[in-house]
Each structure stands twice: as structure tokens, then as C-alpha cells.
Amino acid sequence: MHQEGKDEDAAKALLDYYRARTNVKTPDINLNKVTISKEEQQWADDGLKHTFFVHKGYQPSYNYGEDINWQYWPVKDNELRWQLHRHKWFTPMGKAYRISGDEKYAKEWAHQYIDWIKKNPLVKMDKKEYELVSDGKIKGEVENVRFAWRPLEVSNRLQDQTSQFQLFLPSPSFTPDFLTEFLVNYYKHAVHILANYSDQGNHLLFEAQRMIYAGAFFPEFKDAPAWRKSGIDILNREIHVQVYEDGGQFELDPHYHLAAINIFCKALGIADTNGFRKEFPQDYLDTIENMIMFYANISFPDYTNPCFSDAKLTTKKEMVKNYKSWSKLFPKNQAIKYFATE
């Protein structure tokens, strides 16, 4: 249809295709059993009024105006600016829509999604500027790109938008025109990461794992196999570069270590769901198991972690959930099974 110049018909047919598609899934969301916490419901409802949950360290959340100002920076903390572009309230809006059936959530999500695209153009910039090496010297659209298009934030959106796509897909607000804008934007995100991967560390792991999501969830893109392969190749390489023989992640930070475990596991989750687990060798799993035991051995009896380096405190509830998840991967490991019980 597209080749015949019938773009509107092609977009409608593509939307019908995605609404009927059943062969691609993500482990993050079960559409038959959507649940929402009280906190997520609050984020969704606040989001309708453009009061966006960005960071737990800055509460109550800030309002970004009726005409959203994506460059609003109420406190000059880089994290507040970066994390705005992770759109943490979008998936809760999707859950609220699915549970309530109220179209206001879908309509507002589609509006904010397009508004973000319009107001955050990707302009050319030296890759090193994503780490703010020329702080204070860059202004305007280029300055905004450092925050809106930093590869870590882009990868956040790549992953989370697979859930949002599924949650909002049945909505009348998810029009053929919107689908076209969504797919063009999503493609731009993946291409951007491919050319701007972080050099090392947990950021590189996050980006690689989320490129696997992009390639697995949208296999219809011609470049999807290359996206998936790039992520898998990086994780298979970096699990040996970043993890010492004793199981410790080389940034020597308990929180980054925990994040790395879950990144490696998340990649296995999307692989299992979509049938490409064999692309991860046995020593990949062995290393994850070693990392889990390392983490258990540096944790306190109440499941919390020591807070050195850039670490933040975990909770027992969060860690029991982690151990339960890990125990499914390593059912023969009695120590992990022990920590998974209370």
C-alpha cells in the first residue's frame, strides 16, 4: 500500500496488524492480569495534570505547566533533568487505562508523547557532551539534547515503551497517525543508541539489554536483528569484562552490582519469552549465579546492603522479590532458595 502511495491505508493496516499480533511478548507485563499500586495510580492521576513524578528525592512532584515545558529545571540537579525524560508516569497511565477503561489516560498519554517529540528534537552533538564535559557552556536545543537524548534515558524509553505500546494499543486515541509517529520515534531511539553506546559500566549494560528489547519486540523493523545482536554481543562480552572472578561487578558499588545482576537476568527473560535463550552461553548463567552469591555475602542479615560508593539502600521486601526471581533461574541453589523465603 505504501509503495502505491496509499499511506493512510497502509498505516491503518499496520495498526490492525499490531492489534492482532500475538507472537511477540515481553516479560514485564501480563495484559490478562494488569495491576496498579496506590503510588502508581497517584503518578497516573498527577500526570494528567502535568504534575510529573520524576524523582523520589524531590517530593511533592513539580508541575510542568499546561503547555508542557520539558526544559523546566526547578532545582539545578542533573538527575532531575535527566530523569524527567524517563517518563516514569507513562506506564502507570497505561495501567490505569487498562484497569479503568477511562479514555482520558490514553488521550493524555498520546498528547504528551507527541508533545515530547515536538519539543525535544535530536540535534547533532558530540557524544562526550552527554556526560556534561562542557557544563554551562552549551545552550538551547543542544543543551536540552544532553538531557533528553542521553543514551541511558533513551534506553529507558526504548524498554518502557514496549509496555506502553501494549497497554494503550486498543485505545481509540491510538490512531494510525499516532502509530506512524510512534514507530518513527522508536526507530530513531534505537539508531541513536547504536551510534552512541556508553563506553563502559552499568550504563552500557542497561543500553545493551534494552536494545535487545527493541529488536525482540519490533522484529518488523529491518534493522531489528542488528539491534538485538548488538545488545546480546555486548552483554556476552561485558559480563566477563565487568565481573571479577569472585563475582563482584567492577564499579564496586552494591547498587550497581545489583542492577547488573538484574540487567543480565532481564536479557534472559526477554530471550526466554521470544525463543532465543541459546544465544547466551552457560558461562553467562554461571557468572550471574556467582554475582548473586557475592551480593548475598556482602549484605546485612536484614537484607540491606552497605552504602558505600554511589549505593542506595535496598529494602527486605525488594530483595526477597529479587531472590524469588533468581531462584527460578537457579532452582538447585539452596542458598538463593533460603534467601527467597522469609
PLM regions and their residue ranges:
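Alpha-helix capping and helix-loop boundary segments enriched in small/acidic/polar residues
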Residues: A148-L152, D177-E181, S198-N202, K222-W227, ...
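Short secondary-structure junctions and interdomain/linker hinges
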Residues: R21, K25, W116, V123, ...
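Alpha-helical scaffold segments in carbohydrate-active enzymes
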Residues: D115, D160-S163, L167, N185-A195, ...
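Extracellular glycan-targeting catalytic surfaces
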Residues: M1-D199, L205-I212
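Structural helix-adjacent loops and short alpha-helical linkers that scaffold large soluble proteins
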Residues: A96-A110, F165-Y187, G215-D233, A271-E289, ...
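Short amphipathic alpha-helical segments at helix-loop
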Residues: P74-D77, V142-R146, F174, P219, ...
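Carbohydrate-active enzyme catalytic cores, enriched for enzymes
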Residues: Y244, G248-E342
